[in-house]
Amino acid sequence: MKTSIEVRAYQGALPSEFSSLVPPELRDYLRVLPPNCIALGAIGAGMPLGLAIAKRNGTELSANLQALVVTEPCRRQGIGHQLCGMLESLLRQQGICWIRTEYLGSSHVPSLEASFLQSCGFPEPAPGIHVWNGSFDILKELPRIQSLKLPGDYLVIPFQELTCKERVEIAKGNGDWYPPILDPFAEEDLIDRQRSLALRYRDAIIGWMILEPFHVQTLLFKTMFVRQSHQRTGRGIALLAEASRRIVREGQYKDWIFFVEADNADMVRFMQRRIHHPNVQKEILWRTVKAL
């Protein structure tokens, strides 16, 4: 006999019974559920079976699907579709026109996540961010990382040593000689200004490697850029090599992670060519948006 399913909406906080279904990054919702969030829980025979959470984006007419989870034994029974449909209905009632979601998966399009989302009416997910990760021991094994050096007329300096004049010149170049997604000053309060590097050539800044603590032992290679006139001469990989050697010598971080926006096609190709090792893990943050 099929279990009767009840769907409940929650405000204030998620019930502790749903803790096993809450993703790690949303654990705070068990204590306080933000007022701009909608949470639906599916219950059967007194047990939590599924959970869906969406977050409205401020004054925008869009929302992010933050979680849609169904317990393993209850999958493929329509619970996920039911939660998704009810969540979308509530969002429409609140004037929301778009719902977007993203998930981390393999570099291949066919996946359970993609199939489920498409069955719920979402377009086929597209790459949003390419992600590479591994240990610094792997970087030590890559021949070019160890051997490649910058010529003498190039100078690598800590990002925090940029002069006021250089900072102004870089800021002026945003949208001109480098795209906004490679802005080295974006979320500057989060970056490691001591380990992040700037590349100077004949008294002009022509590139940077921005680093950010990602975890206690993991360092994020957040943004790498070299001016187009210097890209064909291998200065980008040389800058990456210099940053890696410094961090390996220091020994504080064990692992690294590299994010590259899918729009940055040149950098994606660069990483695929240069950071190639059987123990380097490659994933993609897939994104899709549905009109309500």
Positions of PLM-derived features:
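Short amphipathic alpha-helix that is part of the acyltransferase structural core
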Residues: 1-35, 143-181
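Hydrophobic, helix-prone linear segments
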Residues: 1-59, 266-280, 284-287
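A conserved beta-strand-loop-helix scaffold within acyl/acetyltransferase catalytic domains
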Residues: 23-39, 43-44, 49-62, 66-68, ...
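Conserved acetyl-CoA-binding loop-helix of GNAT-fold acetyltransferases
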Residues: 70, 76-93, 226, 232-245, ...
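Conserved active-site alpha-helix within GNAT-family acetyltransferase domains
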Residues: 81, 93-97, 105-127, 262-281
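Conserved GNAT acetyl-CoA-binding A-motif
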Residues: 91-106, 247-260
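C-terminal "cap" of GNAT-fold acetyltransferases
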Residues: 129-162, 274-292
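C-terminal structured domain segments across diverse proteins
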Residues: 231-292
